[in-house]
Amino acid sequence: MPWPLLLLLAVSGAQTTRPCFPGCQCEVETFGLFDSFSLTRVDCSGLGPHIMPVPIPLDTAHLDLSSNRLEMVNESVLAGPGYTTLAGLDLSHNLLTSISPTAFSRLRYLESLDLSHNGLTALPAESFTSSPLSDVNLSHNQLREVSVSAFTTHSQGRALHVDLSHNLIHRLVPHPTRAGLPAPTIQSLNLAWNRLHAVPNLRDLPLRYLSLDGNPLAVIGPGAFAGLGGLTHLSLASLQRLPELAPSGFRELPGLQVLDLSGNPKLNWAGAEVFSGLSSLQELDLSGTNLVPLPEALLLHLPALQSVSVGQDVRCRRLVREGTYPRRPGSSPKVALHCVDTRDSAARGPTIL
């Protein structure tokens, strides 16, 4: 066998099982040359609340406690041998209505936490300050008001992904601007299918991805996205009210590359200047809206635009036609959107600007 292949087999992970708490499954993954490093994944899902606190191996990296009808977790339950070095914890599909402010205080290495599909109604301040979290899933709960500061973590600048979709959130309390109080390092925030009537104040968060899908937003006007200059992907699909897109509503997003407005059938044009300021936008999804046909001035406001989705199977791509050469002084190449219906591959005539 060739040496490179032997090395690949030696370094890649191998999986074996080991003795475990009755009803649980312990799977060992080994890594490195000669299996010199191992981690254990423990699955204790679906056993019932009586299993807590369940003993786990000292080298446990991920613990699955989902679907156990758990009604409470606190610091003492998550402080036994093997718990303090956890990197991943799954508490989804339980009956949790609240969590102790110090519940995760001893999980100093926790990177991924899943609390989805519970009945949480509140999130204590500083819930995650002791853990270097990079992923927090709080979707499908009963949260109504959430403080952005609750997601301040011991991450030392690591990007944080937060999923708050499918809650009852009507207000997001902004992070205070007091000196010396670091802002959460949230780079991806999913607020889809909540009860937000306005774009929340997320100023100064290092956001790159934001989803507000399915919210009853009434208006998106100037200043709505102030302080979010680093945002690259914004999704406003399937909004539950007829949103008004005011001119320059996206002006604060010069770095935005992807904008999704799909699934808003009552959305009408308020003028191409709605998109002014989006100098980096490359992809625009208008499928399922009333924003077709496209206005001729669209590409003038979107100089970097490469593709537009205008229907379930219709995509338009930017087309540059050089025209006659040599070009007349002061003239510019003609720019068009060339649209194709992928169902029948019939091309629509390009719109020349």
Curated annotation (Swiss-Prot):
SUPFAM superfamilies: L domain-like. InterPro entries: Leu-rich_rpt, Leu-rich_rpt_typical-subtyp, LRR_dom_sf. LRR repeats lie at residues 59-80, 85-106, 109-130, 132-153, 159-179, 185-206, 207-227, 230-249, 255-276, 280-301. One of its GO terms (biological process) is negative regulation of transforming growth factor beta1 production. Glycans are attached at N74, N137. GO terms for cellular component: extracellular space. The keyword GTP-binding does not apply. Keywords: Developmental protein, Glycoprotein, Leucine-rich repeat, Neurogenesis, Repeat, Secreted, Signal. Interacts with FZD4 (via FZ domain); competes with WNT2B for binding to FZD4, inhibiting Wnt signaling and repressing peripheral eye development. Interacts with TGFB1; the interaction contributes to regulation of the hair cycle. Interacts with netrin. Interacts with CCN2. PANTHER family: LEUCINE RICH REPEAT FAMILY PROTEIN (PTHR45617), LRRCT DOMAIN-CONTAINING PROTEIN (PTHR45617:SF169). This factor is named 'Tsukushi' because its expression pattern in chick embryos is similar to the shape of the Japanese horsetail plant, tsukushi. Contributes to various developmental events and other processes such as wound healing and cholesterol homeostasis through its interactions with multiple signaling pathways. Wnt signaling inhibitor which competes with WNT2B for binding to Wnt receptor FZD4 and represses WNT2B-dependent development of the peripheral eye. Plays a role in regulating the hair cycle by controlling TGFB1 signaling. Required for the development of the anterior commissure in the brain by inhibiting neurite outgrowth. Essential for terminal differentiation of hippocampal neural stem cells. This is Tsukushi. It comes from Homo sapiens. The gene is TSKU.
